[in-house]
């Protein structure tokens, strides 16, 4: 049943939800990097930046670190294809596990690793151990897109000083790096330190800036068969962002780098979208070499991440964005449909010409006019009105604690056994604050979206019934405030053995996940189910995989791998409308994941070839997102459940030795990642907290962010 709107409005909301389910994201950055052993690559060849690597919550970005000593395709594809935003096998980054000293670093809510955690620490991430999905891992059962373990022990870095200075025309324009390491000293101590600074007063895109300081300090003491190492690092960053616009705006601005997020205030440039990101982290690792064939590694990790992203918003007035569709020429006159007589009148043509002249005639006209917004707010304040325009900030903070312990054993000369446990807990705090009132004198914690449906004295317009009509000043919370609590633990093991020409590997993992919401505001749309803690959702996890490799001789090697897992859904998709209530998504289930791979390798003195074929199938996938629906002035929260997905394709890599000084390298991939069924969609909007259900006809729609 649709919410109680006029029929025309119901139809628009329904169409918007279905369109959202149909269309993959218009823009999703997908960067990968080479994860070879670091010494083989010059640092200047490829550098991560936060904007490339997915710490911007405004976009869906997926970065995959892959590498292999045995698979030439996996060893090179991330680095070589990164400029075209290639995503390994079309897989979401949550299927790629990133570890530091054996501790899993992927975010416990989203499952993804945020590369801003190690931003600027290129030298520190050079000591890496990579595994593919069906290889033997010493720190976990490898995920479907493989994994990597970074070694942050101070003694692992080469002794000496290293200074690097660089200039670039990307998000930052200047970069300086200083690294110092003692190496392992005769006393058994080792110290490593790194300092990186990246800066841009203006990035490549106008209206952007960048300011980031990265630091690392590691200390290690080796005594007898034991080693204790401690490392702490962080990457405090302040940067502004660029916004995607339409072809119409790019055409009139005469630039594909037009950025609608900035404008002039007192004659100076100001960006409305500014990100502040800082996640200080520390890890303590104990290594115990029990015997020459047995080693125990235990690590304790802690991190407190603080992420804030600002945005220009408005209240009971027109949208101030300069590229808002209602002020663009195309909203007045239809230049494409000659039969649309209503929008092809002389008056409409005149409006089109006026809008075109306004937008294209002056740079200031196509940017945010902060001075005008401040003036409007001051006039409203004189009349006793709340802020019409303001800068809000969304916060995603998290406190993470993790423990990992792994035993690595050489059972015989031809067999190895690895097993271990991981425990972790995460408290994610999500809230909104008033960043800048832009000259206004007052603002109140009222759901202005709902005022078109309910009167001012109705409880349902209150964001917090525990503090009705709460006054909001700069720095105060408003709109929503809640925590997501996640705890997880699992046991893993893998065993590998050589048997003549055969090599076998088996791995297994079992554990559980618990998740819960803790609301800090009693929302008027859900007064009984928004304040305080929700119930707890529990999910068991179980999985196994195996591979068999045959060395046929004369350089020919064939390998086959397959696995099946039950994986818990992510907490970031588990709640139907987390900004409003404690409700879990209906039909929330474990993902069922089948993965398989067949590969062939040939290697001789002048030719090296890798050919891989893969097929993966996912069942009971849950996806969640929210969006602003302009026609009804409301945010909508959308959950898709029961999704099935398939990923399949072939990969080819070849290196031909043309001469002693020249190699020809070929790399290619052809694959598919898509939905294989229509899903159930359940949605609600912020103006009337009732749910509607539909069928989303998403079968054969391709994975978002892929070609």
PLM feature segments, named:
Residues 55-67, 84-87, 115-119, 128-130, ...:
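N-terminal periplasmic accessory domains that precede
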Residues 63-104, 133:
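Extracytoplasmic beta-strand/coil segments of soluble accessory domains associated
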Residues 167-200, 204-242, 274, 280-291, ...:
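Transmembrane beta-barrel wall of Gram-negative outer-membrane proteins
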Residues 238-240, 244-245, 249, 460-471, ...:
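Surface-exposed extracellular loop regions of Gram-negative outer-membrane beta-barrel proteins
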Residues 390, 416-553:
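Signature of Gram-negative outer-membrane beta-barrel scaffolds
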């Amino acid at each position: 049943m649709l919410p109680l709107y006029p029929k025309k409005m119901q139809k628009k909301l329904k169409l918007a939800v279905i369109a959202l389910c149909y269309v993959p994201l218009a823009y999703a950055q997908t960067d990968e990097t080479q994860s070879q052993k670091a010494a083989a690559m010059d640092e200047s060849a490829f550098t991560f930046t936060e904007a490339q690597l997915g710490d911007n919550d405004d976009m869906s970005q997926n970065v995959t670190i892959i590498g292999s000593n045995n698979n030439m395709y996996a060893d090179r594809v991330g680095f070589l294809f990164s400029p075209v935003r290639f995503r390994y096998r079309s897989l979401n980054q949550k299927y790629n596990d990133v570890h530091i000293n054996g501790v899993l670093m992927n975010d416990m809510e989203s499952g993804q690793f945020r590369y801003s955690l190690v931003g600027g620490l290129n030298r520190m991430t050079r000591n890496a151990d990579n595994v593919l999905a069906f290889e033997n891992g010493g720190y976990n059962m490898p995920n479907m897109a493989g994994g990597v373990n970074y070694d942050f022990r101070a003694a692992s870095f080469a002794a000496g000083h290293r200074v690097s200075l660089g200039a670039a025309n990307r998000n930052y324009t200047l970069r300086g790096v200083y690294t110092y390491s003692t190496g392992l000293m005769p006393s058994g101590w080792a110290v490593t330190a790194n300092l990186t600074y990246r800066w841009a007063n203006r990035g490549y895109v106008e209206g952007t800036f960048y300011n980031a300081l990265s630091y690392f300090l590691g200390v290690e003491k080796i005594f007898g068969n034991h080693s204790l190492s401690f490392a702490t690092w962080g990457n405090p960053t302040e940067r502004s962002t660029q916004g995607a616009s339409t072809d119409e705006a790019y055409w009139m601005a005469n630039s594909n780098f037009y950025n609608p997020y900035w404008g002039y205030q007192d004659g100076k440039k100001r960006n409305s979208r500014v990100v502040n990101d800082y996640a200080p982290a520390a890890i303590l690792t104990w290594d115990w070499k029990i015997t020459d064939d047995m080693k125990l590694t235990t690590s304790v990790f802690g991190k407190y991440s603080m992420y804030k992203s600002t945005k220009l918003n408005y209240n009971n007035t027109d949208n101030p964005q300069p590229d808002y569709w209602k002020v663009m020429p195309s909203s007045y006159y239809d230049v494409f449909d000659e039969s649309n007589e209503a929008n092809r009148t002389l008056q409409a043509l005149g409006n089109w010409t006026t809008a075109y002249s306004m937008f294209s005639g002056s740079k200031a006209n196509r940017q945010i006019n902060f001075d005008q917004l401040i003036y409007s707010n001051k006039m409203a304040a004189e009349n006793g009105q709340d802020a019409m325009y303001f800068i809000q900030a969304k916060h995603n903070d998290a406190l993470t604690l993790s423990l990992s312990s792994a035993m690595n054993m050489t059972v015989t000369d031809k067999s190895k056994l690895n097993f271990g446990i991981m425990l972790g807990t995460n408290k994610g705090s999500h809230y909104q604050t008033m960043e800048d009132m832009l000259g206004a004198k007052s603002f109140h914690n009222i759901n202005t979206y709902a005022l078109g449906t309910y009167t001012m004295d109705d409880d349902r317009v209150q964001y917090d019934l525990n503090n009705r009509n709460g006054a909001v000043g700069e720095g105060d919370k408003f709109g929503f405030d809640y925590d997501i609590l996640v705890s997880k633990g699992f046991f893993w093991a893998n065993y590998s053995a050589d048997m003549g020409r055969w090599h076998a590997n088996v791995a297994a993992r079992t554990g559980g996940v618990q998740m819960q919401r803790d609301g800090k505001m009693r929302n008027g749309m859900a007064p009984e189910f928004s304040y305080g803690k929700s119930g707890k959702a529990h999910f068991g996890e179980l999985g196994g995989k195996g591979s068999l490799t045959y060395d046929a001789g004369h350089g020919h090697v064939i390998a086959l791998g397959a696995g099946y897992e039950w994986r818990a859904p992510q907490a970031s998709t588990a709640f139907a409308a987390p900004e409003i209530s404690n409700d879990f998504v209906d039909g929330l289930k474990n993902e069922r994941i089948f993965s398989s791979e067949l590969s062939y390798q040939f290697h001789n003195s002048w030719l090296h070839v890798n050919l891989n074929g893969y097929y993966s199938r996912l069942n009971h996938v849950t996806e969640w997102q929210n969006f602003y629906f302009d026609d009804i002035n409301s945010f909508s929260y959308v959950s898709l459940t029961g999704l099935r997905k398939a990923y399949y394709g072939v990969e080819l890599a070849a290196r031909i030795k043309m001469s002693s000084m020249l190699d020809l390298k070929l790399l290619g991939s052809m694959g598919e990642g898509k939905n294989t069924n229509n899903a159930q969609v359940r949605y609600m909007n912020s103006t009337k907290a009732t749910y509607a259900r539909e069928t989303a006809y998403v079968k054969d729609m391709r994975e978002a962010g892929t070609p």
